[in-house]
Design a protein with these regions (language model features):
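Hydrophobic packing residues in well-ordered alpha-helices of helical domains and bundles
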Residues: 6, 10-13, 35, 39-42, ...
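Amphipathic, well-ordered alpha-helical segments in soluble domains
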Residues: 9-20, 41-48, 68, 72-75, ...
Length: 110
């Protein structure tokens, strides 16, 4: 995968995690604490991975960080599933979109 494609994907992921953070804030107390923590962590990791990609072309390190980001995305998606129908649909959609974008990048990198 070309570095410019990785950077484009990471920009999309960061945008998706921005939307998830906004949805968590909008949901307020409806958002479970574990989901809130996962979304915050996913957002921070997405920003860190994007910065790493801009600074370095070390593919192995970048792949490892994307793998970690996907694990965080998995936890966020699972937290949404545990919350069930009580969760704001916009929040659930934002988390799923971020998770899917991360998963797609991981598949392309492996």
């Amino acid at each position: 995968m070309q570095m410019n494609q990785v950077n484009d994907s990471l920009a999309r992921i960061e945008q998706c995690t921005d939307q998830a953070v906004a949805a968590v804030r909008q949901a307020g107390q409806q958002a479970p604490d574990d989901l809130r923590q996962c979304v915050d962590q996913m957002h921070a990791q997405a920003r860190d991975v994007r910065n790493l990609a801009k600074q370095s072309a070390d593919e192995a390190q970048l792949t490892s960080r994307v793998d970690q980001l996907e694990q965080t995305g998995d936890r966020a998606k699972q937290a949404c599933q545990r919350a069930g129908s009580a969760l704001d649909p916009q929040l659930q959609s934002a988390v799923v979109q971020a998770h899917d974008a991360i998963s797609n990048l991981k598949k392309q990198m492996h």
